[in-house]
């Protein structure tokens, strides 16, 4: 029996199933679409101003403060302890949400929820430490799909219970507490990884290429962004550099290894962001994600402002379910659309940023709750479609380690931007704007993003046309020779 359990645990199926079960129950939270009616209702008796200006900003600030330390800690302790910590934070969040009272307690709730969101990196990174590379794509798809399915199922369940069974919002939170508690139990059964991406990367793998050749200096393959060639994790580089063997690596002090890892991170990020293509897609990712998170934080308050939950039937659960499902379908469809994203990608950023701005303006100006719901559906679906394209454009030429770094830094920059918006627009120490005016600001924000990338798209189109005119009289030129004027146009040469 022990042999069977050991062989099962060592395969990729067992950790994938356990992780997916954790992901499902941690995201199956039917109380989520009805959080604002619960907080402003008789259970908590909080005002809209208290929720908007005093409670919700705490999540943004705590997420920003915790993200980078948790990102480093996740790799250092090899993922599982941070996943368990996330499960504990989930339970504390919902216990306080159920039985706590007052603004201060709800601010503590937001702090622990910031811990939950900061620890999400462990859920997505864990699988790369226990699954062989040939299963990465499949398993990553499972993990992401199950969270979308769980969120959709939770939203549908919530709407059915509220509309048909007239269930109290309090009991929706009881169901959420039970669900996240089950997720915590599943986290205890995850196998402990023997390696991680950076601090505990295995140094004993065979190196196919000669260690005397620096991969950064090798000729870039056609279609790869300069400086973003696939590179080995730090500890593997140390062990294969000809200066340190495995025994010497093990004898290094942990502080030295930590410094080496941070130095390698800095070098990797510097090389990756030197690619203009990756830089501009990352720029859109950071700015758009900041705006998207801000809208998600406060959209329920806007709905409650347009149609108060005490006076009318609300359909937040149905809207969230449709929006999530529609976004997932749009993101899935991207893989089957034959488009040269290198040529039209930034134009797509312009078009959909305009769509996002228009949907937010609609949500601000309309007095009809159904039009407000429709604007949100359009906004969320278009963002999920574009973020899928952006992730692919960024990750296509990066290995897992470099993608994790770029993802972490992009998320951190998005949080910095979101924090600045929160301080200026939302916080009581800033402008303290009412929620309806906030959405006018967010719509203007996406309009500015569209304007920036419109100018960038026009510049690329003009540069490409000029370059073709220059190259056409000289067809005998060596196509492998890089021209100085092509540097700003490097995205045109990428193969998908």
Swiss-Prot record:
Keywords: Disease variant, Glycoprotein, Membrane, Transmembrane, Transmembrane helix, Transport. It is found in: Membrane. One of its GO terms (biological process) is thiamine-containing compound metabolic process. Changing residue 87 to V: Significant decrease in pyridoxine transport. Widely expressed but most abundant in placenta, kidney and liver. It catalyses: thiamine(out) + H(+)(in) = thiamine(in) + H(+)(out); pyridoxine(out) + n H(+)(out) = pyridoxine(in) + n H(+)(in). It holds the Pfam family Folate_carrier. The chain crosses the membrane at residues 8-28, 54-74, 82-102, 111-131, 145-165, 170-190, 283-303, 317-337, 343-363, 376-396, 406-426, 435-455. Glycans are attached at residues 45, 166. The keyword Protease does not apply. InterPro entries: Folate_carrier, MFS_trans_sf, ThTr-2. Residues 468-496 are annotated as: Disordered. One of its GO terms (cellular component) is membrane. Pyridoxine transport is inhibited by carbonyl cyanide p-trifluoromethoxyphenylhydrazone (FCCP) and carbonyl cyanide m-chlorophenylhydrazone (CCCP). It is linked to Basal ganglia disease, biotin-thiamine responsive: An autosomal recessive metabolic disorder characterized by episodic encephalopathy, often triggered by febrile illness, presenting as confusion, seizures, external ophthalmoplegia, dysphagia, and sometimes coma and death. If untreated, encephalopathies can result in permanent dystonia. Brain imaging may show characteristic bilateral lesions of the basal ganglia. This is Thiamine transporter 2. The gene is SLC19A3.
């Amino acid at each position: 029996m022990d042999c069977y359990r050991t062989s099962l645990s060592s395969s990729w199926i067992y950790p994938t199933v356990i992780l997916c079960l954790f992901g499902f129950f941690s995201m199956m939270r039917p109380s989520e679409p009805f959080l604002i009616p619960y907080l402003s209702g008789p259970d908590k008796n909080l005002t809209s101003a208290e929720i908007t200006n005093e409670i919700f900003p705490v999540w943004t600030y705590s997420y920003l403060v915790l993200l980078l330390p948790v990102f480093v800690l996740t790799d250092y302790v090899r993922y599982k302890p941070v996943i368990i910590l996330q499960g504990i934070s989930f339970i504390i969040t919902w216990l306080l949400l159920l039985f706590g009272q007052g603004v201060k307690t709800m601010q503590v709730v937001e702090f622990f929820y910031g811990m939950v969101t900061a620890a999400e990196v462990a859920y997505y990174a864990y699988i790369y430490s226990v699954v062989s590379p040939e299963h990465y794509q499949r398993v990553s798809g499972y993990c992401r799909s199950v969270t979308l399915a769980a969120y959709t199922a939770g939203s549908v369940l919530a709407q059915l219970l509220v509309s048909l069974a007239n269930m109290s919002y309090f009991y929706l939170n009881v169901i959420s507490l039970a669900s996240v508690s089950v997720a915590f139990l599943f986290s205890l059964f995850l196998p402990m990884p023997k390696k991680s991406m950076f601090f505990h990367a295995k140094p004993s793998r065979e190196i196919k290429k000669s260690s005397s050749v620096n991969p950064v200096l090798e000729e870039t393959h056609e279609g790869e962004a300069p400086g973003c060639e696939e590179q080995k994790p730090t500890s593997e580089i140390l062990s294969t550099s000809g200066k340190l063997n495995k025994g010497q690596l093990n004898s290094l002090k942990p502080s030295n290894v930590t410094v080496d890892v941070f130095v390698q991170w800095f070098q990797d990020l510097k090389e990756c962001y030197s690619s203009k293509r990756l830089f501009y897609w990352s720029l859109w990712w950071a700015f758009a994600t900041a705006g998207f998170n801000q809208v998600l934080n406060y959209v329920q308050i806007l709905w409650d402002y347009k149609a108060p939950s005490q006076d009318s039937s609300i359909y937040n659960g149905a809207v969230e379910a449709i929006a999530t499902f529609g976004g997932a379908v749009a993101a899935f469809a991207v893989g089957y659309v034959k488009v040269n994203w290198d040529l039209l990608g930034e134009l797509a950023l312009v078009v959909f940023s305009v769509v996002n701005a228009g949907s937010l303006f609609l949500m601000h100006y309309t007095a009809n709750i159904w039009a407000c719901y429709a604007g949100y559906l359009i906004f969320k679906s278009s963002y999920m479609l574009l973020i899928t394209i952006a992730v692919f454009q960024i990750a296509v030429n990066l290995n897992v380690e470099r993608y994790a770094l770029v993802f972490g830094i992009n998320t951190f920059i998005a949080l910095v931007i979101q924090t600045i918006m929160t301080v200026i627009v939302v916080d009581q120490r800033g402008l303290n704007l009412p929620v309806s005016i906030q959405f006018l600001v967010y719509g203007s924000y996406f309009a500015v993003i569209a304007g920036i990338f419109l100018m960038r798209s026009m510049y690329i189109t003009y540069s490409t046309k000029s370059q073709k005119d220059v190259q056409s009289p000289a067809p005998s030129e060596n196509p492998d020779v890089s021209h100085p004027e092509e540097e700003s146009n490097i995205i045109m040469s990428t193969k998908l």
